[in-house]
Amino acid sequence: EYETMDMKKLEKWLSTVEKSCTVFLCGASNSSGLTLRALQILHQNGVKMDIVYFVPEVEVLSEEKTLNERAVRGVLQNYARSGLFEKICLVSNLRLEEIAGSTNVFDYYSQINRVFTSSYYMMDVFKNTKPITSTFKRPKESCRITTIGLGSLEKDDLMFFPCNQEVEVVYYYGINEEKLKTEENLFRTITNKVKSRITDETKVSFGIYPTQ
């Protein structure tokens, strides 16, 4: 369908995007083909792009949508590996539902989307805030396929997409400022948590941020 659209109008609108942008999409949506074309135009315009890709439950999709989703996801991952994007973040709707806990039909997508948006927002805040201390390293050029998740010092991490091979893990610890000032051995607790995730194949870094 997108091939019949007025591409000149699309190109004109995309020309207003400068420097960088983040694109959110799902391969099962009817607009995914148009989005792929838009990404090509943005790349030609020299725009740096991050992609957030929502993976649906393909088992319940129609055959047509299943094939479309797999094709779009494969194209995006190849684009990411080739450097067309800065990175692609994979997010599973099923994982979001599991983390959200109790959901209802009427508010289902709002409830699972809230899990993602609140987490993504805080990550953006932390990335643009100077940490109290950090061990952040420059990410490898090859690490372009990513995901995010939630974690705590007491529990296992809850990832938004299953990762078969973790090359780099980055923790952003948002901790109450008063707790940072008063809790004894907290830095050691954080360091031990990080060290427990390090392997020969996985490098781990972290930053600590005060919250109210």
Where are these regions (language model features)?
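Tubulin/FtsZ superfamily GTPase core signature
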Residues: E1-Q212
